[in-house]
Structures are given as C-alpha cells and as structure tokens.
C-alpha cells in the first residue's frame, strides 16, 4: 500500500487529537523515522502542541520531544515438548518493536518521579554494553536499557536533545523535566482566564518544576511569583477602571493585594 499516504493521514488525524506519547512499532521498517521527527518538531515549535514520540535509532533527533530508543530487548519463551522437557526460545525485540513498551513507561510514570532505572520485568535480557559505551551513548541522546545483574532496567531517562543553546539548556535533555515543562505549557499557559486562582495554580506548577531542578542540582534555587510592578503597569496601560472584590477603582488606586487579585485578561 501507499505507506507515505498512510503516514500523512495519520499525522493529520493526530494533529487534532489529545495525546502525550506516540510510538510506531514499524516506523523504522517503513523508513519514516525522520518524517515523524520533523512532524513532532513542527508540532512543538510551530503549534505549541507538546507531543512526544519514542522512536528507534533516531540519531539525528536532537529534540526534547523525541526519545531515541536504541536497545534490543529479549524475552525467553518456554514451550512444553510433551515428554517432560521444555524448549526455551529467546525472542528478540528490535528497537522499533520495543518503542511501545518504552512509551508506556513514560506515559505511566507519575509526574513526581523520573523513569530513570524503571524496571522492565517483562523482559529477560537486553543488548548489553559496558559502562563506558553506555555513558557515551547516553551522552549522545540515546535511551538504553541495561542489565543490573538481576533484571532489565531503563538507563538514564534522556531525550534526544543534545545541542544546547542560550534558550534551551541541559534541562531539555531530561525526559522528566520536559514532561514538567510540557505540562505547564499544556495545562495552564493560554488555557485559563488570568484569575487569581488560576495564576496560583500556574505558579504552583512552575514552582514544582523548579523544585525538581533544585533536587537534580541543575539550579540552586528558583521560585515563581506574581510580578506586582508589571501587573500594575499592565492594568494602568489599559486605561480602564478595574473591578476587584465587587469594587470598581482606577488601577493607580489599587492596593498591592488588589493588583494581585485583579483579572488581567487572557494570555
């Protein structure tokens, strides 16, 4: 069939659906890894649509919305021969076949914790690398599985983002922090009226994100709060009276608390 046509239709469909994570277990065989990378980048950068994809061997990904899964997984399957003996067959899951499982880990991991070292108990082994090779791979934005002596686990939960800029720093390399940032973007920014309650919700989410950065040693401290000076300047620039707690006043007559509570319109 027309694989390109199917992919185009799929991308068009998902542009109007709500989801966070995507995996396509035939994407490498179909020769469409780069197309999905470009599409995810476009959705994130141009449409503020914070989707993410787990893709196999997406070495040119370099995007916080792309997880570059690069390990083979193995599962031992036992069949009964009927003569008191069994045959154990080792089944290999290529990187592309493993992507749905990895996407499932990210989608199912609580926002308060990282997927780093998450166990994959449904597999019996993984493509093994020595620690130096693992560190090198992780440093180039590859997500790996590793064998800890007892079970298969995820290595450090990194995104494929590697080329840092003044705007995007090392925090974009960590899947957990990207999830936090996406949640702030998706759940709050531009979605709610700028009421005091909604501002408090946004500030709580951003401060939770900052706390993760502090815990990871990425920043020493960070807090978000309502900027009273900017908010007062904005209200005055509108040139209109403001109603706060049932009272209508000119912006310059508002107390600091009233400025904080005032609705400042949409984002």
Where are these regions (language model features)?
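Extracellular Cys-Trp
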Residues: 1-118
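Structured, hydrophobic secondary-structure cores that serve as assembly/anchoring elements
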Residues: 101, 105-128, 132-267
């Amino acid at each position: 069939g027309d694989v390109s046509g199917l992919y185009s239709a799929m991308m068009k469909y998902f542009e109007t659906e709500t989801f966070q994570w995507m995996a396509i277990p035939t994407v490498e065989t179909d020769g469409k890894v780069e197309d999905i990378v470009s599409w995810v980048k476009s959705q994130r950068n141009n449409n503020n649509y914070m989707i993410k994809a787990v893709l196999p061997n997406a070495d040119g990904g370099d995007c916080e919305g792309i997880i570059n899964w690069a390990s083979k997984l193995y599962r031992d399957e036992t069949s009964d021969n009927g003569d008191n003996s069994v045959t154990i067959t080792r089944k290999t899951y290529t990187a592309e076949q493993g992507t749905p499982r990895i996407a499932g880990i990210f989608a199912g991991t609580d926002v308060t914790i990282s997927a780093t070292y998450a166990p994959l108990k449904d597999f019996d082994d993984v493509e093994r690398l020595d620690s130096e090779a693992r560190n090198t791979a992780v440093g180039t934005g590859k997500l790996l599985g590793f064998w800890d002596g007892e079970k298969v686990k995820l290595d450090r939960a990194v995104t494929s983002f590697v080329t840092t800029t003044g705007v995007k720093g090392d925090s974009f390399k960590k899947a957990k922090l990207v999830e936090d940032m996406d949640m702030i973007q998706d759940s709050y920014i531009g979605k709610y009226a700028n009421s005091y309650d909604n501002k408090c919700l946004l500030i709580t989410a951003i401060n939770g994100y900052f706390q993760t950065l502090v815990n990871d040693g990425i920043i020493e401290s960070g807090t978000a709060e309502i900027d009273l000076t900017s908010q007062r300047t904005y209200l005055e620039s509108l040139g209109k009276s403001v109603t706060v707690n049932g009272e209508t006043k000119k912006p310059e007559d508002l107390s600091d608390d009233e400025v904080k509570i005032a609705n400042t319109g949409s984002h």
